[in-house]
Amino acid sequence: MAVPTLLPCDGCGQLASAEHIARRLQRLEWATRFRPIHIQALLLTASAPEADSDFLYSPESFTGQAGDLLTALGISTAGKSSEEVLADFQKRGLVLASLLECPIEPDTNANEARALLEHHLPQALARIRRSLKPKRVLVVSPELQPLASHLSESAPGCPVFYTFFATFRSEFASDASELAAFRAALPALAAQGT
């Protein structure tokens, strides 16, 4: 019997099985399909959610993070196919991306998770600067707060704004005031221009 080989994943830096890599590539394919040509705002989270249904670009239903984000943006899912909903998100010039493109393994402690984020940050910033090229970055994960000094305007090559959204921490739910602040941040960013 062959011993499974674990290799570092390009998307998150964690040691990964073939299934992990296949799942990352599937999610990358889903996200690429709805990537706008000109990205007005990149919504940056710490890591991808565990469940595919929580992953915004999944063809499944929009639950968890995906549902909360769409609600915060005022994008209705009622009576629409996932393609119609994602096309609306795309038309707004928005992209949701994660510093770690894969979920953090469940047995990873907080210090290990932070080390993963710090280690993968240069690669993620290079991707933002060279490939995505957004007009602005909106950091929405509270877990990225300790990396704020590394996420300055010069690192991604565009203005960086912080409006933490608790839904991107699996153990918290966003409250009404947080949703209102998040909704208010997007038009303000658009008015800033670059």
Describe the role of every protein-language-model region.
Residues 128, 190-194:
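Extended, charge-rich low-complexity interaction segments
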